[in-house]
Design a protein with these regions (language model features):
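Conserved catalytic cores of very large enzyme subunits
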Residues: 1-127
């Protein structure tokens, strides 16, 4: 893990890390979460519609060139309803990736639906 992180940090010397570099760091750390030889990592990366790096994170030969990315599910996070053209471009991108990534998550729809699915009598847990 440390060697992989060092490569990323050295490549970003003098600038901020980009979204894909941060995603890869998260995945490399996730590779270390193993108990009894079983991976115990569950990761999701939410990205903006305009983030081309994350859109293409699981395209091409990623499973051999960047196998750490298999640890995470990647989803686009809409904050409002996209226009039909933007939405269809994202579906085409999902098809062309051949990986089923990026998924689609709508933050506002989730906020509207959450009260119907939450028992407010509980005072524990997350989310």
């Amino acid at each position: 893990m440390f060697r992989n992180l060092a490569v990323i940090w050295k490549g970003a010397a003098g600038r901020k890390l980009n979204s894909l570099e941060v995603h890869d760091i998260m995945c490399y750390i996730g590779e270390c979460v193993v108990v009894g030889g079983v991976r115990r990592t569950s990761l999701i990366s939410l990205s903006n519609h305009s983030d081309e790096r994350m859109r293409h994170a699981k395209m091409g030969n990623w499973h051999t060139e960047n196998p750490q990315r298999s640890l995470a599910n990647n989803s686009i996070c809409f904050t409002d309803k996209p226009d039909m053209g933007a939405f269809m471009r994202e579906w085409v991108s999902i098809y062309e990736s051949r990986s089923g990534e990026r998924g689609v998550f709508n933050r506002e729809a989730c906020k509207r639906m959450a009260p119907e699915r939450r028992d407010t009598d509980h005072d524990f847990g997350c989310n």
